[in-house]
Amino acid sequence: MPPSLPSLQLRRLLLRSFISSSSVNTLQSQPRIISSKPLFSPLPPSRSSIFSTFPSRFFSSETNAESESLDSNEIALSFSKELTGNPDAESQTISQRFNLSFSHITPNPDLILQTLNLSPEAGRAALGFNEWLDSNSNFSHTDETVSFFVDYFGRRKDFKGMLEIISKYKGIAGGKTLESAIDRLVRAGRPKQVTDFFEKMENDYGLKRDKESLTLVVKKLCEKGHASIAEKMVKNTANEIFPDENICDLLISGWCIAEKLDEATRLAGEMSRGGFEIGTKAYNMMLDCVCKLCRKKDPFKLQPEVEKVLLEMEFRGVPRNTETFNVLINNLCKIRRTEEAMTLFGRMGEWGCQPDAETYLVLIRSLYQAARIGEGDEMIDKMKSAGYGELLNKKEYYGFLKILCGIERLEHAMSVFKSMKANGCKPGIKTYDLLMGKMCANNQLTRANGLYKEAAKKGIAVSPKEYRVDPRFMKKKTKEVDSNVKKRETLPEKTARKKKRLKQINMSFVKKPHNKMRRRM
């Protein structure tokens, strides 16, 4: 058949063009040409096998293009769905599923962190995710990525899995991994396990035991008030790692956080006898501890007890710094002694100290709480002129607005809200929700709706809620009086009615002239 030869040659040319071309457009256009001519004879079996591979090549290139355009958040969500879909599955099966579904994706640290944060219920399925990462040739673990898994298992209090991860990456785990492990153990309330981990971490997990790691462990323990265990650990390792002044200051702060002032003074005495200098940081911690104990037991003893600590600082030649004044001002404001705090604020320059951002923020909150609104606004202006205006973020403004709404100063809260926006600070969901709730409580629904529309225009997703109106601001409903029901007279009304009736009776006995007599007259 003569027409069959050109058709076969044309098909072979088309097949060569399919094989040589790699773009998606040629792959989409050529099948249309073939299907548009029904006169062509069918391909031989050998050629059909080659042509049958084209759809798979087309779809794989399409998925690669899509995977490059996908956002990292969407990829993390798909990873999380895969992990939480079957959390009881074995790690090998999870790794195989990831190889089948996500072989075209190259993981990075941000993607791993997002996936683990979105999958709190995955549990041990995260080990399968970790195996898939190990099998991926384009990825290699670092100290940071290992710390992500350590933090994940520690957050779930699965410390067995956490230790498995650390021992698996013995040569890779470093300072970040150690910090995550210690932090999770301390926050879980296992200080003894922390000391055991520190003793054998160099042999079992390849983590260095040096002064830096000891300082980290002591700091984490003392932040949660486990100063006794931290002090024992420091004394046991003193022959290997001799403590410095920083470690001693951390131990004093740990005793002060636990509100054990006697132990803190004992340790300070041992430090001074051992040749260590007690610095301003240690005295500030003891001063804060004294203020806390006085606030709890007897606030009137605050001033004499504070003076004792300050006199000891002067006797030992320890200078005051800004943190010293911040401790005093903060504790005075907590017991509503704002006037004394303002006096102390004015005397900071006598000791060569300048207020910082924390000083201004504490005083602004205290002044607003005391309803000294004008002075609070002046303090905000002073803070800006001192160069700390950038630290007035939406979190701090939210605290100011919450205080003003709490003392029923809604109008001033709205003026602070306007100045917040004028300074370039964008309010968030909590700020709008707070003001809308207060306006609805004051029965100002129109203004609340205006705020809701403003938030919607800015793209802030404020969810509408049911706000209760304060009964003080509700309009009192007038009771409808039924005219058929006889109203009970009051005593003045009854007296007036009796007087009127008596007058009528008295006037009835008076003889009145006739009309004819009036006309004659």
UniProtKB/Swiss-Prot annotation:
Xref: Pfam families: PPR, PPR_2, PPR_3
Span of the annotated motif Nuclear localization signal: 486-503
PROSITE patterns in the cross-refs: PPR
Keyword terms: Mitochondrion, Nucleus, Repeat, Ribonucleoprotein, Ribosomal protein, RNA-binding, Transcription, Transcription regulation, Transit peptide, Translation regulation
Chain spans, region Disordered: 480-499
Record-level GO cellular component terms: mitochondrial matrix; mitochondrion; nucleus; ribonucleoprotein complex; ribosome
Superkingdom classification of source: Eukaryota
Protein name (Swiss-Prot/TrEMBL): Small ribosomal subunit protein mL104 (rPPR9)
Chief place where the protein resides: mitochondrion
Single Gene Ontology MF annotation: mRNA binding
Tissue: Expressed in root tips, lateral root primordia and leaf primordia. Highly detected in the mature pollen grains.
PPR repeats mapped onto the chain: 174-204, 210-240, 244-278, 279-313, 321-355, 356-390, 393-427, 428-462
Subcellular location: Mitochondrion matrix; Nucleus
Keyword Transcription regulation among record annotations: yes
Phenotype upon gene inactivation: Embryo-lethal at a early stage of development.
Matching InterPro entries: Mito_RNA-Proc/Resp, Pentatricopeptide_rpt, TPR-like_helical_dom_sf
Gene it is expressed from: PNM1
Subunit structure: Interacts with NAP1;1 and TCP8. Able to bind mitochondrial RNA in vitro. Component of the mitochondrial ribosome small subunit.
One GO biological process term: regulation of translation
Function: RNA-binding protein that functions in both mitochondrion and nucleus. In mitochondrion, it is associated with polysomes and may play a role in translation. Required during embryogenesis. In nucleus, might be involved in the regulation of its own gene expression.
